[in-house]
Amino acid sequence: MTIKESYNVAGSPTTWGDPVLKANVTDCSALSVERLEKAGVVLFGKTNVPLMLADYQSYNAVYGTARNPWNIDLTPGGSSGGSAAALAAGMTGIDAGSDIGSSIRNPAHYCGVFGLKPTWGVISPKGHALPNVVAYGDISVIGPLTRGA
């Protein structure tokens, strides 16, 4: 499976689309990543995000622009737009995104895939935060995107 770029994956850069964080290679994985890998999941890629996960599209100066695979002139949405685009293009079957203000739901809608914003706290956000940030967002949730419900 793939995972949104903003999740910590040991040995992989986690930039949140910010060029200042381009060299931020984490040495430990997010709790959700650890649980997925313990269950046998193989992560084979991270998907694009807008700068600081704060836009309705998925462009950043680190990785460029994610495009909607149904029409490359259109956005796949944001902030989990890279996730939804990868699913719609058939590059992956499942992706882990995050959502505060429709960051899973809008990209899923734009790309014709399924996205779920679960109840807050169902999945731990540990490891899905900017470097050196101790507190977690009190409204951010971790959730899945898939090709279908």
Question: Where are the regions a protein language model picked out?
Answer:
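Gly/Ser-rich catalytic/binding loops embedded in alpha/beta enzyme cores
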Residues: M1-G101
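Fold-level recognition of mixed alpha/beta catalytic cores in primary-metabolism enzymes, strongest
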Residues: A84-A149
